[in-house]
């Protein structure tokens, strides 16, 4: 049955997460790694403190807004660039090199540049967009090339035009690969936003992480990191479900 199969596939991952959480708590309780590794229960207690809940919610909302806007902008730019290179072969090599060069720039260096070009509040979005652009560009570019020669021969024999072939053949074969790229881009967008927030943003999880490091607030630091991880995993899980639906519709 599908439900039994789903449970069977999910069980190893769930057990692995549970084991990791137990080890985290044990290491924190025993103090093997020192004061900088607090117990998981202490981190959760910090997250649930009424005086800090509003702070965490505001920071999460700010980071999600920056990362989400950058994710959408970078994804759209990557999609358009990949389609342009696919439809106009003379642009392909130049676009690929441009994407590779942009991706090779470290996020901290990008944030420094954008700090001069745009406002401090826009820097997290800009960094996230640039890092997402490369992932989506490569995913869409690879997906558009994934149709087999036999499939292309069939459409050629039917006299299908270029744009009709793109819509009926290349886009459907591209979607599963693009969905994988969209999943991979989620943590990248969040990391880009966090790094951008370190350069003068007024709020965000990146700001909380930086302030906690500077003031040696260990529980606050781990709480912000845990919250960022949970947000990333939640979005990743949603996109995984969407990917499964897309694959079922295309098979």
Task: Spell out what each predicted region is.
Residues 1-18, 237-251:
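Transmembrane alpha-helical segments of polytopic membrane transport and secretion proteins
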Residues 5, 29-72:
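Periplasmic/extracellular loop-to-transmembrane helix junction in inner-membrane transport proteins
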Residues 116, 144, 191-228, 247-251:
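Glycine-rich helix-loop "coupling/hinge" segments at transmembrane-helix boundaries
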Residues 139-184, 205, 209:
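Short cytoplasmic-facing helical segments at TM-TM junctions of multi-pass membrane proteins
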Residues 69-99:
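Transmembrane-helix boundary motif in ABC transporter permease subunits
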Residues 126-130, 163-196, 222-223, 227, ...:
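Transmembrane alpha-helices
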Residues 89, 145, 176, 222-251:
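C-terminal transmembrane helix and the adjacent membrane-cytosol boundary/short C-terminal tail
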Residues 100-135, 142-143:
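Generic hydrophobic transmembrane alpha-helix motif, especially the helices
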């Amino acid at each position: 049955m599908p439900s039994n199969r789903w449970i069977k596939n999910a069980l190893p991952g769930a057990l692995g997460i549970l084991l990791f959480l137990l080890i985290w708590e044990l290491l924190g309780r025993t103090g093997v790694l020192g004061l900088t590794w607090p117990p998981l229960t202490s981190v959760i207690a910090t997250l649930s403190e009424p005086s800090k809940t509003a702070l965490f919610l505001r920071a999460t909302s700010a980071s999600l807004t920056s990362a989400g806007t950058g994710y959408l902008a970078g994804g759209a730019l990557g999609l358009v660039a990949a389609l342009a290179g696919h439809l106009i072969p003379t642009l392909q090599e130049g676009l690929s090199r441009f994407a590779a060069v942009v991706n090779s720039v470290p996020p901290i260096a990008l944030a420094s540049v954008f700090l001069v070009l745009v406002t401090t509040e826009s820097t997290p979005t800009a960094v996230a967009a640039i890092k997402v652009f490369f992932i989506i560009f490569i995913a869409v570019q690879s997906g558009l090339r994934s149709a087999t020669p036999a499939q292309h021969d069939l459409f050629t024999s039917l006299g299908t035009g270029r744009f009709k072939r793109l819509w009926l053949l290349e886009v459907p074969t591209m979607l599963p690969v693009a969905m994988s790229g969209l999943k991979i881009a989620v943590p990248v967008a969040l990391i880009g936003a966090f790094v951008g927030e370190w350069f003068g943003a007024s709020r965000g999880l990146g700001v909380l992480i930086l302030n906690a490091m500077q003031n040696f607030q260990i529980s606050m630091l781990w709480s912000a990191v845990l919250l960022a991880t949970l947000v990333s995993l939640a979005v990743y899980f949603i996109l995984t479900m969407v990917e499964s639906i897309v694959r079922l519709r295309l098979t």
